[in-house]
A protein has these predicted regions:
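Alpha-helix N-cap and loop-to-helix initiation/capping positions
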Residues: 60, 64, 153-156, 197-202
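Soluble or luminal CAZymes and related metallo-dependent hydrolases
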Residues: 68, 72, 156, 160, ...
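A short, flexible beta-alpha/helix-coil linker loop
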Residues: 52-53, 148-150, 193-195
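A short interface-forming secondary-structure element
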Residues: 183, 187-201
Length: 235
């Protein structure tokens, strides 16, 4: 989102911002985008990337992100012949990112990478631009990333994940919160400061919520571990 603000303020050409509507995108993320677009005067296009109709994506393989981004960039290309810019930053290159291969296929440019800008610098830029509500937002990968590799992506799983994470965000506010759907069941991962605040009352609320979605096993709680639903070595 910071890139969108920079583009709007500095480029002397028409710029259109694209945001994907999807069960894998939390509702609050879409609401945040719409709020910023209205306040900043962006030209915003809300699009359906149709990844939920792609069986390759739904099978949740190790390179699921490739199919997600391929669908997204293909859809954006239907709206414009202009260059597509992504908010990918320098730190993203140190991780396994199959979506970057899709970006190559569509000749997507990554201005932050080209300028050697990482996450810390982006937060400083956001602060300098007065973007107080996003400068400290924790990383928020799509909800499908919470589903263990090889388990199919479904609307029901995504709704469960979104509902649980919204409940926990209402309880804790900002912080790293992940609801993982794994073969062993539901695992809630929290940063240590939040994990220490989980009490019996909150556990009961979460248990009641996941039962609505047909999960009757107990919910596990553990410290946050980046990418713990990703099983690259098994597939």
């Amino acid at each position: 989102m910071t890139l969108a603000h920079i583009a709007k303020r500095t480029l002397n050409v028409s710029v259109t911002m694209f945001h994907a509507l999807s069960p894998a995108v939390p509702r609050e993320a879409t609401e945040r985008i719409e709020r910023h677009a209205k306040n900043a005067g962006w030209q915003l296009e809300l699009i359906n990337a149709n990844e939920m109709q792609d069986p390759n994506y739904l099978e949740n393989p190790v390179n699921r992100c490739f199919f997600c981004k391929s669908n997204l960039y293909s859809r954006i290309a239907q709206f414009t012949s202009q260059p597509i810019l992504s908010g990918t930053n320098l730190d993203d290159l140190s991780d396994f990112r199959p979506g970057l291969e899709a970006a190559k296929d569509f000749e997507v440019r990554h201005p932050f990478v080209e300028a050697n800008i990482g996450k810390r610098d982006i937060r400083l830029i956001a602060e300098d631009l007065g973007l107080d509500d996003i400068k400290q937002l924790p990383a928020a990968p799509c909800l499908s990333s919470r589903i263990e590799t090889g388990l199919h992506v479904t609307n029901e799983k995504l709704m469960l994940i979104d509902s649980v994470e919204r409940l926990l965000k209402e309880e804790f506010g900002l912080g790293i919160i992940r609801c993982r759907v794994k073969r062993v069941g539901i695992v809630i991962e929290l940063e240590e400061t939040l994990l220490n605040k989980v009490d019996c009352n909150l556990r009961q609320k979460v248990d009641n919520l996941v039962r609505i979605y047909g999960h009757n096993k107990g919910v596990e709680y553990s410290s946050y571990k980046q990418g713990s639903a990703f099983l690259r070595e098994k597939l």
